[in-house]
Amino acid sequence: MLKVIAEQEHYLLISDGQRFTVVERRAGKFYPLCTGVRHGLDLGDETIAELISRSGSYSERDAQRRLTEVASQWRELFEHVR
């Protein structure tokens, strides 16, 4: 079952109950954090496996750290170009 655990800026820490990952939310779609072409997906129980597979699976602690890191990088970039 999909669970949103935390949210910072445009990023969410999500879990399927066993695995954790961070995804980006833009324009109502959710994107894995990976290199290459990324296609937006609807967030749901049926898409969480693909998001975790493409974004990487982490322990909850490591995923929380990744969320903080990615959101901080986004904020720094936003402040720089603003």
Task: Identify the residue ranges that each predicted region occupies.
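Negatively charged, low-complexity tracts enriched in Asp/Glu with abundant Ser/Thr
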Residues: 1-14, 76-80
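Mixed-charge, Lys/Arg-enriched low-complexity segments
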Residues: 35-82
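Short linear proline/tyrosine/threonine-rich motifs used for host-factor recruitment
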Residues: 12-14, 20-24, 30-32
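Generic intrinsically disordered, low-complexity segments enriched for polar/acidic and small residues
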Residues: 8, 17, 27-28, 55, ...
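A structural microfeature
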Residues: 6, 23, 34-36
